[in-house]
Amino acid sequence: MPNAECRHNAGFWSAAYAEMPISKFTAYAENAVLPKRKMDGISAYADMPKKIFGGICRYAVMPKNSECRTGMIQTQPGTKIVFNAPYDDKHTYHIKVINSSARRIGYGIKTTNMKRLGVDPPCGVLDPKEAVLLAVSCDAFAFGQEDTNNDRITVEWTNTPDGAAKQFRREWFQGDGMVRRKNLPIEYNP
């Protein structure tokens, strides 16, 4: 199989010698589901067979040593953040973000409700295998009188450029590189 050159083009991952974007294969992230085949990781794309979808695409590969692969993170808790009543005072919940990859990443935190939810620190840089403890705070509010159904924290991260200082830069997220996201819904117990 020829060497592939990975590039980002208008939101689609494409590969050399490919006649359609790799996104058509619904292959986006680790554990991606491909036609009748579940992959264990991004490097497994290099083993994909020729002529998927009736020969429309000759190759759909992502090189194993690709610079465009974004490192993975883990969060503790992994699926949601829970705040317990009463809500007359400010609550703080700590979450841990771990860079489980072999690359330095920059991360930024977004919230869907900036009046009620805050995160400290809201952004930063993590070296490989490094972790940071984030304080997620919930300001006092009238529970039951305000809509809380769509509240969530979103962790966004991307690889830092090679040789970059360990200082967060917003422009890392504004270029054409891959930015990953993990949503952590907020649950409010009465």
Swiss-Prot record:
<keyword id="KW-0966">Cell projection</keyword>
<comment type="function">
    <text>Central component in molecular interactions underlying sperm crawling. Forms an extensive filament system that extends from sperm villipoda, along the leading edge of the pseudopod.</text>
</comment>
<dbReference type="InterPro" id="IPR000535">
    <property type="entry name" value="MSP_dom"/>
</dbReference>
<protein>
    <recommendedName>
        <fullName>Major sperm protein 32</fullName>
    </recommendedName>
</protein>
<dbReference type="InterPro" id="IPR013783">
    <property type="entry name" value="Ig-like_fold"/>
</dbReference>
<dbReference type="GO" id="GO:0005737">
    <property type="term" value="C:cytoplasm"/>
</dbReference>
<dbReference type="GO" id="GO:0031143">
    <property type="term" value="C:pseudopodium"/>
</dbReference>
<keyword id="KW-0963">Cytoplasm</keyword>
<dbReference type="InterPro" id="IPR008962">
    <property type="entry name" value="PapD-like_sf"/>
</dbReference>
<feature type="domain" description="MSP">
    <location>
        <begin position="72"/>
        <end position="189"/>
    </location>
</feature>
<dbReference type="GO" id="GO:0005856">
    <property type="term" value="C:cytoskeleton"/>
</dbReference>
<dbReference type="InterPro" id="IPR051155">
    <property type="entry name" value="Nematode_MSP"/>
</dbReference>
<dbReference type="Pfam" id="PF00635">
    <property type="entry name" value="Motile_Sperm"/>
</dbReference>
<keyword id="KW-0206">Cytoskeleton</keyword>
